[in-house]
Curated annotation (Swiss-Prot):
This is Riboflavin biosynthesis protein RibBA. GTP binds at residues 249-253, 270, 291-293, 313, 348, 353. CDD domains: GTP_cyclohydro2. GO terms for cellular component: cytosol. The active site is at residues 325, 327. The record marks 125, 163 as: Essential for DHBP synthase activity. NCBIfam families: PRK00393.1, ribA, ribB. Pathway: Cofactor biosynthesis; riboflavin biosynthesis; 2-hydroxy-3-oxobutyl phosphate from D-ribulose 5-phosphate: step 1/1; Cofactor biosynthesis; riboflavin biosynthesis; 5-amino-6-(D-ribitylamino)uracil from GTP: step 1/4. Catalyzes the conversion of D-ribulose 5-phosphate to formate and 3,4-dihydroxy-2-butanone 4-phosphate. Catalyzes the conversion of GTP to 2,5-diamino-6-ribosylamino-4(3H)-pyrimidinone 5'-phosphate (DARP), formate and pyrophosphate. The gene is ribBA. Keywords: GTP-binding, Hydrolase, Lyase, Magnesium, Manganese, Metal-binding, Multifunctional enzyme, Nucleotide-binding, Riboflavin biosynthesis, Zinc. It comes from Staphylococcus epidermidis (strain ATCC 12228 / FDA PCI 1200).
Length: 393
C-alpha cells in the first residue's frame, strides 16, 4: 500500500475531504474513512454510506461527551478492542434521523456549544464514540485517530468514521484499500504514522521534581519526569553545561544488573562507566523504564531460563513471543527537547539507539564508545549483541 504524509492528510481534511486511516496489522488491520466534523458536509456522510458501507460513527473528545451527558452504551464493555460507544443519538430537529443530511445535522450538533443534552433523542442513528485521553498515544484506534486529526486541523475534537467494506461484504484490506484510494482519489495514512508524527512534534513529558543527587560517582542534578500518555516515571541526571553537543547516555533500566550487579549482562558496568564519564566531562544520563529491552522483569527472567537451556538473548525473546528489541526512544527524545537539545554526542555501542533518536529529530554529532570488561558469565551475551544485534563492541 502507498501511504501519504500526515501533513497531506491534514490538508485534505481541512478541505472537507475524507481520508483513509489504516490501523496496525496486529489489530483490526482495516481501513476507515475519516472526516472532521467541522469541515464535512452532507456529501461526506452520503459517500461513507454509499462507498464505505460500514457503521457510521462519530468519535468525540471525552469533554464533549460529558458536556452533553452521553452515557456509555454498555457499562460492562466487553468489546475486544475496548471501543467506547455511547448511546446512539438523533438531533431533535431531525425526522427519522437516518438521511445523510440528518446524520450530518446530528454530528454538527455535537460540536455546537449551544447544544444541550436535551437536544438529542436517544437512541438514534448516529453512534458517538469517546476517544481515550491523549489519543493515539494511549490507544491505537480509529476513534482516537479521528479526534487527533481533528485537533491537528485546528477544528473541534470530533469526526465521523466508517469502515470500508468490499462489494461482497468482506472487510477491505491491503490491495483492496489501495484500489479504493486510487478509485476515489483519497489520501491514506496509518495510525502508526500518526503516532510517530505526534511524538515528533509534541512535547508530552512533564517535569515533576528536581533535586541535588550526591552519588559514589559524583554530584549530579536529578530530574523526575512523567508522560501524558502512560504511568511511566523517568529520571535524568545532569552535570554541567548542556548547551553545545552535550554527552548523553540513554540507559535502559536493568534491575538485575544495575541494582544486584548481575554478571549475566554488561548493564550495571555500563551505567557506572557512564556516570563516571558524565561526572568528568558533563552531560546527561536518561534512565528509561525498559527492563529486558522492553519485555519487563519477569519475562526477562523467563528469557534467562531459556538461555540456561541453550538459547541466546535474541532467540530467547523470540521464543517467548517478543521481538528481539521492543524499545522506543521517543521519551528520551522528548526529554532532550525539554532541555532544548537537538544535537548530542551519544554514549552507546548500539546503532538502533542512533536510529531511534534520529527518527524523533535528534542529531547524533558523535558516538562515544562505551566498552566495559567482559565477565566469565556474559561472554556469550556480548557475542550475541555484536554478531546478531550489530553492537559496535
Amino acid at each position: 500500500m502507498q501511504f501519504d504524509t500526515i501533513e497531506l492528510a491534514i490538508e485534505a481534511l481541512r478541505n472537507g475531504e475524507s481520508i483513509i486511516v489504516v490501523d496496525d496489522e496486529d489489530r483490526e488491520n482495516e481501513g476507515d474513512l475519516v472526516a472532521v466534523t467541522e469541515w464535512m458536509d452532507d456529501n461526506t456522510i452520503n459517500f461513507m454510506a454509499k462507498e464505505g458501507r460500514g457503521l457510521i460513527c462519530a468519535p468525540i473528545d471525552k469533554s464533549i461527551a460529558e458536556r452533553l451527558k452521553l452515557q456509555s452504551m454498555e457499562q460492562n464493555n466487553t468489546d475486544i478492542y475496548g471501543t467506547h460507544f455511547t448511546v446512539s443519538i438523533d438531533h431533535y430537529k431531525t425526522t427519522t434521523g437516518i438521511s445523510a443530511h440528518e446524520r450530518t445535522q446530528t454530528a454538527r450538533a455535537l460540536i455546537d456549544e449551544n447544544t444541550n443534552p436535551e437536544d438529542f433523542h436517544r437512541p438514534g442513528h448516529l453512534f458517538p464514540l469517546i476517544a481515550k485521553e491523549n489519543g493515539v498515544l494511549t490507544r491505537n484506534g480509529h476513534t482516537e485517530a479521528a479526534v487527533d486529526l481533528a485537533r491537528l486541523t485546528g477544528a473541534q475534537p470530533a469526526g465521523v468514521i466508517c469502515e470500508i467494506m468490499n462489494d461482497d461484504g468482506t472487510m477491505a484490506k491491503g490491495e483492496d484499500l489501495q484500489s479504493f484510494k486510487e478509485r476515489h482519489h483519497l489520501k491514506m495514512i496509518t495510525i502508526k504514522s500518526l503516532v510517530a508524527f505526534r511524538k515528533a512534534v509534541e512535547l508530552n513529558v512533564n517535569l515533576k521534581a528536581k533535586v541535588k543527587m550526591p552519588t559514589d560517582f559524583g554530584h549530579f542534578d536529578m530530574y523526575g519526569f512523567t508522560t501524558d500518555y502512560s504511568d511511566e516515571e523517568i529520571v535524568a541526571i545532569v552535570k554541567g553545561d548542556l548547551k553545545s553537543n552535550p554527552n548523553v547516555r540513554m540507559h535502559s533500566a536493568c534491575l538485575t544488573g544495575d541494582i544486584f550487579h548481575s554478571q549475566r549482562c554488561d548493564c550495571g558496568a555500563q551505567l557506572e562507566a557512564s556516570m563516571k564519564y558524565i561526572d568528568e566531562h558533563g552531560g546527561m544520563i536518561i534512565y528509561l523504564p525498559q527492563e529486558g529491552r522492553g519485555i519487563g522483569l519477569i519475562n526477562k527472567l523467563r528469557a534467562y531460563e531459556l538461555i540456561e537451556k541453550g538459547y541466546d538473548t535474541v532467540t530467547a525473546n523470540l521464543a517467548l513471543g517478543f521481538d528481539e528489541d521492543l524499545r522506543d526512544y521517543h521519551v528520551a527524545a522528548e526529554i532532550l527537547k525539554y532541555f532544548d537539545i537537538s544535537e548530542i554526542n551519544l554514549l552507546s555501542n548500539n546503532p538502533k539507539k542512533f536510529e531511534g533518536l534520529e527518527d524523533y529529530g535528534i542529531e547524533i554529532v558523535d558516538r562515544i564508545e562505551l566498552i566495559v570488561p567482559e565477565t566469565q558469565y556474559n561472554h556469550s551475551y556480548m557475542e550475541t549483541k555484536k554478531n546478531k544485534m550489530g553492537h559496535l563492541i
